[in-house]
Regions:
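Conserved phosphate-binding/catalytic loops in two-lobed NTP-binding clefts
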Residues: 108-109, 265, 282-307
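Glycine-rich phosphate-binding loop plus the immediately following alpha-helix
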Residues: 124, 147-191, 215-225
Length: 338
């Protein structure tokens, strides 16, 4: 069996072909960073137009590298959401057309579930139960995984996601886009204790996240210290802000560990490429005597290999895909907390 996965939830146009043995025959990702850089963030209309321009090439190149034809595919998979609705519809419409023409199943995939599945691409035997921290530009969520394909939402962001907070501070300082990698590079030689940021935490015992207060505190520091690209303590400021974001992420994860008693921890999503976060995450896992799993950087950011992999797992376990033309995209988070 071979499955073609398509991912267009935000600003990467991606396609991948996986076998039922989870061997990646090809994976192509076309970034739009240069398109959105002048605006300091993703412009939804430009993103969807760029997907329209690129998707035919990306899928064709993916099939060429995999040395497979449409007739050689057994199923298709596509991200349904959450994400930018215009971008999602480009990928979904393209996948529907292929699946309907070839009379093959089309598996609809949730973007956050696909990010969790990315950990299994290289670590197929992760012990359960597990707690997964999904951190990306648009989402920050905690999940409890009782087993494969069985996840429960523990907490999510109430406002800005971690990646959004990093991007917005970078944009305010004129550091470039995408902001997260720029901040990481400039913060590498800084003192993370130079500027004090309070740990944001929701009321009661909630495991939800909120980064708007942290962002506001950073903007206040920028105003009070006249922080700029040329400020002598810019590296210290960025290191302190990055450290505060990481502490906030792992504080909730640590409380989830105490409450739900997992045997494994998973870190995934685009922000999981951050070296400081990866280091602190592994330190937490070691101190808690838990196994830790993080995808390789290439599988942290949006890609179609994780989409195809989740489809393979669903088909392997007997999950029946819906009717091709009935599938629809959804921009908002809809995973149940039950």
């Amino acid at each position: 069996m071979a499955v073609l996965g398509i991912e267009t939830s935000c600003d990467e146009t991606a396609a991948a072909v996986l076998t039922v043995e989870r061997k990646i025959l090809s994976s192509v990702v076309l970034s739009q960073d240069e398109v959105h850089a002048p605006y300091g963030g993703v412009v939804p209309e430009l993103a969807s137009r760029q997907h329209l321009h690129s998707i035919g090439y990306v899928v064709g190149e993916c099939l060429r590298r995999a040395a497979i034809s449409l007739d050689g595919l057994d199923a298709y998979a596509v991200t349904l959401g959450p994400g930018l609705i215009g971008s999602l519809l480009v990928g979904l419409s393209f996948a529907k057309g292929l699946a309907y023409y070839c009379q093959k199943p089309l598996v609809g995939i949730d973007h956050l579930e696909a990010h969790m599945e990315s950990a299994f691409l290289e670590h197929p035997d992760i012990p359960f139960p597990a707690v997964a921290l999904v951190v990306s530009g648009g989402h920050t969520s905690l999940f409890f995984l009782k087993k494969r394909l069985d996840s429960k939402l523990l907490g999510r962001t109430r406002d800005d996601a971690a990646g959004e907070a990093l991007d917005k501070i970078a944009k305010f300082l004129g550091l470039g886009y995408p902001g997260g990698p720029v901040i990481e590079k400039m913060a590498s030689a800084g003192d993370p204790e130079k500027f004090a940021f309070s740990l944001p935490r929701m009321k009661n015992s909630s495991l939800d996240y909120s980064f708007s207060g942290l962002k506001t505190a950073a903007l206040k520091w920028i105003d009070e210290t006249k922080m700029s690209k040329n400020h002598p303590h810019l590296g210290d400021f960025l290191a302190s802000f990055e450290e505060a974001v990481v502490r906030a992420l792992l504080d909730n994860l640590s409380r989830a560990v105490q409450e739900f008693k997992p045997v494994s921890l998973i870190l995934c999503g685009g922000v999981a490429r951050n070296k400081r976060l990866r280091l602190r995450f592994e330190e937490l896992a070691r101190s808690s005597r838990l196994s830790s799993f993080i995808p390789s950087p290439q599988f942290c950011t949006d890609n179609a290999a994780m989409v195809a992999a989740l489809a393979v797992e669903k088909l392997r376990t007997g999950k029946k895909p819906g009717r091709v033309l009935d599938l629809d995209a959804y921009p908002r988070f809809i995973i149940s907390t039950e």
